[in-house]
Regions:
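Feature marking well-ordered beta-strand scaffolds used for ligand recognition
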Residues: 1-224
Length: 224
């Protein structure tokens, strides 16, 4: 059968590229699209069946479009937009990375219009989006590192000397363990989340190398 590789691009002007590799000795570009704005990128995409999810992240907060777009790729030469999930807001750069392998849920490292970080660099966190109706994606659940959102009843974490932010970078959910999210959190280390109840992700364990061993979390419960 026909084999298509879908490629994300690190920065503008290109959005994504489809390469026909049915004959691996003769790869052929069959589709290439452009981003609508130069201040954004789409360096993360995933496909499942005839649906593709593409992450959009802007260079600065408050810009648009920022979020996630779903495409019908049943005809690789002519992908069609199904829906756009808007994540833009005054403290948001949109979606950095996403994971989509079951055709039902998109797991993503993302900002949100209603999330106000305690530090400007801590703007992205884990979100689970229900795409079983791809024309109407809806958030099911979310989780952020305690102390990184204004209003948390936890002290903000101490900053690293080389401060890259306490924010989500990658969220992996493998088919063998759909109830686990393996979440890379840059300066926050790595977390393993129980997502068996996707509306209420819970931390199971973590690995961290924070700069101060004296910093201790006061409470694991944070407002959503």
């Amino acid at each position: 059968g026909r084999r298509i590789i879908w490629l994300a691009h690190e920065s503008a002007p290109k959005n994504f590229t489809a390469v026909d590799v049915s004959d691996p000795r003769k790869p052929k570009v069959v589709c290439q699209t452009d981003l609508p704005q130069s201040h954004m990128r789409s360096n993360s995409l995933e496909t499942c069946g005839n649906i593709m999810a593409v992450a959009y992240q802007t260079q600065k907060k408050g810009l648009q479009p920022a979020g996630m777009e779903l495409f019908d790729i049943s005809n690789p030469e002519k992908p069609k937009s199904i829906s756009f999930y808007d994540c833009s807001g005054p403290h948001s750069r949109g979606v950095h990375q996403l994971w989509f392998c079951d055709g039902e849920y998109v797991h993503m490292a993302s900002s949100s219009p209603d999330f106000v970080p305690t530090h400007p660099s801590d703007d992205q966190f884990y979100r689970c989006i229900d795409v079983r109706n791809p024309s109407k994606p809806v958030e099911l659940g979310r989780w952020h590192m305690p102390g990184t959102k204004q209003g948390d009843n936890v002290m903000p974490p101490p900053r690293h000397p080389l401060d890259k932010g306490y924010r989500a970078h990658n969220c992996n959910v493998y088919p063998q363990r759909p109830d686990r999210c393996y979440l890379a959190y840059i300066d926050g280390g790595m977390f393993v989340l129980d997502i068996s109840d996707k509306a209420n992700p819970k931390r199971i364990s973590e690995w961290t190398r924070r700069p101060s061993a004296s910093w201790k979390r006061q409470d694991e419960t944070c407002p959503s």
